[in-house]
Amino acid sequence: MNEKALELQQKVQEKVEVLKKQGGFKILEGIIDGKKGIRDMNPKSEARRSAFLTDEDKAEKRRQLKSELEVLKELVEAGSLTEATDKAKSKSAEIAKLLKDNLKNIFKNTQDLEKAYRSVDLFFRNADEQSIRNLYFLNIPLEEFVSADNSNLREELTKHFDQNYDRFSLEDNYSLLVIPGFLGESLDYWSKQASKYRVTLVTDYTDELEFESIEDNIEERKIAGDARYLANTLVTCNYAVARQRYEGIEDDDLYLPMSIPLAGKMYSGNGIQPSAGKKHGKIDGVLGTRLPLLRTHVDKIDKMGMVPIIYEKEWGTVAMSDTTLANESTDPDQRAIGVVRAKDWIAKVLLDYFNSLTFQNFDGRLREEIKQQLNKFFDKIKGHGKLIESFSIDELKKDPDNPQAVLVSINVKPYFATKHYVIDYSGTQGSFAHEEK
């Protein structure tokens, strides 16, 4: 061993003797977090120390401990207590800034992923189910649905829907298509697809910071109308707070569109009963809404053909309409989503049933059997708390112009959810008397 090495060894030994007088290795154990490996370096346990220095699974702990010791070394070398304190404060501020910057980047880079997972969580919460059958996720960004140039996506989805709807048995057909976010110019296309396959499209309007922006945008390009295919589309308006911001790291709370949780509500609800209002439209798992909508705002949004999402302290976050995009239709059945969904479901049941009867001779026996089955089916879904108020089988006979066709005419009267209560009240002689004392 050369002279320089001996001198270094002597200095190290002197420092060790000083440490022993001050409390030994316990000083380091008291300064450095034990989770970072300092206890593993205690010289009293040579085997533990050796394992810590050589095991591959301890590499991260060794890196953390080295970093801590380097900081401690800098403080010891600072000289006076004042210099050491100033250096510690400077180092702490530097590390705090680095941590803050890293957290900002983490939240920014993982925001889309967080939104996706939180949205799925909201669906399950509002569906009130731990396990859901026949639920499919498409890992496709909104931009792909918005783009009219993405013919491949449109072709593949059309093919997929055909595979499940263009069949004699409709047991695997879809009932909901949920596309969170605003579809822009492509909203019309996806509405037509939903109508074609008797599916309810649930989507959203843009995330606006003030109500006036919604009015201006709708005035410039309205999305509602009277076309039949618009009756299968539900558009929510007003984003909700999924999580409050982390102070000093994020500039704003985390907001999510409400199409997914509303679809969860619709999945678990009664077909004719819309997921709207205080009792049936409460969205679970959110903290409030972007816009504090008033009743006048709600009425205007409803007339725009959208479902306003409101927040009331006693109610929570609530969907406050059952209107479809076909809110300008003269047919009230097309304006209420509960009625649209109920009639679509009934139509699918009838298609499935009559498909199973094809190529049977239509004689008196079969005619009577069909009538019995139809009466039995409609009786099950008729009455309070069910889908329809009444029904009538108006026609069930052979087509006089086509011997291989049978004409079936059924009329149903669905239940409608109450949107307004018109109150007319008066007191004695048409006015309320008020006597001041």
PLM region spans:
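Short, hydrophobic/π-rich interface segment
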Residues: L366-I388
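Short secondary-structure junctions and interdomain/linker hinges
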Residues: V76-E83, P308, Y353, L357, ...
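Acidic, glycine-rich, low-complexity linker/loop segments at the periphery of domains that act as short
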Residues: N2-F25, I301-I310, K386-K437
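Small-residue-rich
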Residues: M1-R221
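Residue-level marker of positions within ordered structural domains that often coincide
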Residues: F182, D379, Y415
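Long, contiguous, structured domain-core segments that constitute the functional module of a protein
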Residues: A240-Q373, S409, K413-K437
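Generic structural hydrophobic/aromatic packing signal, biased to beta-strands
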Residues: L177-I179, L201-V202, I346, F391-I393, ...
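Long, internal scaffold/assembly segments composed of regular secondary structure
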Residues: I214-S259
